[in-house]
């Protein structure tokens, strides 16, 4: 069969139609991770300001918890991308 494709080319992603989207996805994961870390730092700042003003302890705690979740997700994406 002259037109059959070798399955190992798809596994190793050496063909452009397979390899390029995988490279783009890998690059975008690290960009998303950096964006999540920046949002995390912003939420920490907002949470500290809300907690410092007082009277809104629940809202401040929610921002701090959200920042921890987003920061963990961003760090995980960057870590998995570099390993």
Curated annotation (Swiss-Prot):
Record flagged with keyword Transmembrane: yes
Compartments, record wording: Virion membrane
Keywords, ordered alphabetically: Late protein, Membrane, Transmembrane, Transmembrane helix, Virion
TM stretches of this protein: 31-51, 59-79
CC terms in the record's Gene Ontology section: membrane; virion membrane
Main location: virion
Top-rank taxon, per record: Viruses
Induction behaviour: Expressed in the late phase of the viral replicative cycle.
Keyword Transmembrane helix: yes
Family from the record: Belongs to the asfivirus EP84R family.
Protein known as: Transmembrane protein EP84R
């Amino acid at each position: 069969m002259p037109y059959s494709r070798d399955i190992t080319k798809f596994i190793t992603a050496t063909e452009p139609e397979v390899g390029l989207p995988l490279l783009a996805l890998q690059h975008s994961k690290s960009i998303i991770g950096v964006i999540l870390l920046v949002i995390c730092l912003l939420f920490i700042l907002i949470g500290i300001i809300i907690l410092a003003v007082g009277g809104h302890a629940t809202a401040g705690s929610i921002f701090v918890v959200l920042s921890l979740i987003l920061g963990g997700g961003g760090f995980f994406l960057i870590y998995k991308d570099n390993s």
